Amino acid sequence: MDLKKYVTIVPDYPKEGVQFKDITTLMDKGDVYRYATDQIVEYAKEKEIDLVVGPEARGFIIGCPVAYALGVGFAPVRKEGKLPREVIKVDYGLEYGKDVLTIHKDAILPGQRVLITDDLLATGGTIEATIKLVEELGGVVAGIAFLIELSYLDGRDKLDDYDILTLMKY
């Protein structure tokens, strides 16, 4: 199935010059959303995953159905101040400054094999920060899966040591 047919390109959003990849038009078609999810599930089965981790918010949209299909848990990575219990955190750079990602301190057990999911790989900053959180808790990043990769931003270069699946490349 050509998943790109179901992604809407929105010009000049959220700012001029950006060609935003809107996945809601993929997700609102059950058979297409299921197909994309199933592709990630098949990839993950080979990795013997214990837990799926995804950064907010679209990492949840991808990761939760994958975790459900695999019969494993899902641990959210959120911006600072959004998780109610004790967390660990990591600062990471954005094109316009810095932000902080957090995960519950007890979300991952040492040695657990983790699949990280997100909708889009751009510069790699968010996933690089997510990897740091997983590894700080003793998790093993067994794989990383994205719906979309923006190849021209070279985000994959930051992730050389990891196995990556992308379903669509632009």
Curated annotation (Swiss-Prot):
It holds the Pfam family Pribosyltran. It catalyses: AMP + diphosphate = 5-phospho-alpha-D-ribose 1-diphosphate + adenine. One of its GO terms (biological process) is adenine salvage. Catalyzes a salvage reaction resulting in the formation of AMP, that is energically less costly than de novo synthesis. It comes from Bacillus velezensis (strain DSM 23117 / BGSC 10A6 / LMG 26770 / FZB42) (Bacillus amyloliquefaciens subsp. plantarum). One of its GO terms (molecular function) is adenine phosphoribosyltransferase activity. This is Adenine phosphoribosyltransferase. Transmembrane segments: none annotated. Its EC number is 2.4.2.7. NCBIfam families: apt, PRK02304.1-2, PRK02304.1-3, PRK02304.1-5. Pathway: Purine metabolism; AMP biosynthesis via salvage pathway; AMP from adenine: step 1/1.
